[in-house]
């Protein structure tokens, strides 16, 4: 059985939306992502509505959002999430009502990258420096990179 989830990467300049299909075996596939400029939308809710219209008016009842900034901890999101270079405000307590979803997940954008790295196959990596070895099955994964600021995440 496939489950569909709206996945969103929200930064200071862009919000990228896609539909992820998750197979019974855990395999994830994405449809073609759509990039919306945050400056073109007064709020995340209006960007969501624009994406929903592009998808024919119906979206899955679950959303997973990777957000550029602090989101709180699992099960205890920040009551108000603000962006550095984007006037949007997300209030997790209102997500289900405002977006018409039944479930949501919030994660920092670089934490999302760290989770993706943990699932990646060795063939998806490009060796740049240091020992040329496959990623270990255990241990800490660190991800660092530029975005609106300098993003860092560790996955244990």
Regions from the language model: what does each represent?
Residues 1, 56-59, 135-137:
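Flexible, charged surface loops at secondary-structure boundaries
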Residues 2-3, 101-102, 137-141:
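Short coil/turn connectors at secondary-structure junctions
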Residues 10, 132-138, 143-146:
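Solvent-exposed alpha-helices and their adjacent loops that cap or buttress functional pockets
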Residues 12-14, 110-115, 148-150:
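Conserved A3 ("GATE") glycine/threonine-rich loop of ANL adenylate-forming enzymes
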Residues 117-137:
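Short, flexible, glycine-rich and Lys/Arg-enriched loop motifs at helix boundaries
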């Amino acid at each position: 059985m496939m489950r569909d989830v709206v996945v969103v990467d929200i930064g200071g300049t862009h919000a990228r939306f896609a539909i992820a299909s998750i197979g019974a075996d855990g395999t994830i596939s994405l449809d073609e992502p759509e990039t919306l400029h945050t400056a073109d939308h007064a709020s995340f809710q209006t960007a969501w509505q624009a994406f929903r219209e592009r998808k024919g008016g119906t979206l899955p009842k679950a959303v997973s959002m990777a957000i550029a900034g602090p989101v709180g901890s699992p099960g205890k999101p920040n009551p108000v999430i603000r962006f550095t270079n984007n006037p949007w405000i997300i209030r997790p307590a209102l997500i289900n009502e405002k977006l018409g979803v039944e479930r949501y997940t919030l994660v920092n954008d670089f934490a999302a990258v760290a989770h993706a790295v943990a699932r990646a196959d060795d063939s998806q990596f490009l060796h740049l420096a240091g020992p040329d070895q496959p990623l270990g099955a255990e241990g800490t994964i660190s991800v660092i990179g530029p975005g609106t600021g300098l993003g860092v995440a560790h996955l244990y």
